[in-house]
């Protein structure tokens, strides 16, 4: 039975990784900076406590926040956790005197993790989780101002900033209980992902189609 569970976990991990790298989990202009919006870490019990479950050590819960908690893995058992997350984004504001609104829905996996005992009071844990997400598209129009020494020659220009992508975290850790109520843990983490950002400026045509683009 333990071998079957390990095989199932091994099959689901690449599927979850593929789903994560092909989806957008954020819709915010603030994600244009750095690696984007960071996700709340941990499994559901940890997230329900606001992500402060570092000290939580239970034989029935996989604690992704603290590798020392892996030492609580019960003998002859295998803990497997798979989490899903759905979010709704709604924004309403006035633009040029008109009310406009946007709404987005996302649904994706949040974490996949397992924990198993290596020996008495020695446990191993593995997790694959989305670390951060990028998703934005903003548009700005610079009106024509003939009195401006620069923009008077350029004319009306429109700017579009957009980006999407994500960063995924994979973690492998070991926890060892030295004595009662005292455990040590160590973990190795690896991050990967793709974030694409682009900037396009379209001025009023002077010659040709008047379009210039630059991708960063």
Where are these regions (language model features)?
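Short acidic/polar capping segments at secondary-structure boundaries
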Residues: 131, 177-181, 188-195
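Short hydrophobic "helix-edge" motifs at membrane interfaces and signal-peptide entry regions
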Residues: 5, 55-57, 169-170
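Well-ordered mid-protein domain cores that form the structural environment of catalytic cofactors
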Residues: 104-170
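Outer-membrane beta-barrel translocator domains and adjoining extracellular loop/strand segments
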Residues: 90-97, 137-145, 196-205, 210
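Extracellular loop and loop/strand-boundary signature of outer-membrane beta-barrel proteins
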Residues: 96-100, 155-160, 208-216
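N-terminal, post-signal peptide beta-strand-biased segments of exported outer-membrane/organellar beta-barrel
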Residues: 17-132
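Bacterial N-terminal signal peptides
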Residues: 4-14
């Amino acid at each position: 039975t333990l071998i079957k569970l390990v095989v199932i976990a091994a099959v689901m991990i690449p599927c979850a990784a593929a789903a994560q790298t092909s989806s957008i989990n954020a819709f915010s202009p603030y994600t244009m900076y750095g690696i984007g919006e960071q996700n709340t870490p941990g499994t559901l019990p940890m997230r329900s406590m606001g992500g402060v479950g570092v000290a939580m050590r239970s034989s029935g819960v996989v604690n992704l926040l603290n590798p020392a908690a892996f030492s609580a893995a019960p003998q002859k058992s295998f803990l497997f956790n798979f989490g899903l997350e759905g979010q709704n984004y709604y924004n309403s504001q006035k633009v040029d005197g008109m009310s406009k609104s946007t709404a987005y829905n996302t649904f994706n996996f949040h974490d996949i993790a397992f924990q198993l005992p290596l020996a008495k009071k020695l446990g191993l844990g593995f997790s694959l989780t989305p670390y951060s997400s990028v998703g934005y598209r903003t548009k700005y129009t610079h009106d024509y101002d003939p009195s401006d020494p620069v923009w008077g020659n350029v004319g009306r220009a429109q700017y579009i900033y957009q980006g999407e992508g994500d960063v995924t975290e994979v973690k492998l850790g070991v926890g060892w209980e030295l004595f009662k109520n005292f455990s040590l843990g160590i973990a190795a983490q690896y991050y990967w992902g793709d974030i694409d950002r682009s900037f396009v400026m379209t001025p009023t045509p002077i010659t040709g189609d008047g379009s210039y683009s630059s991708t960063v």
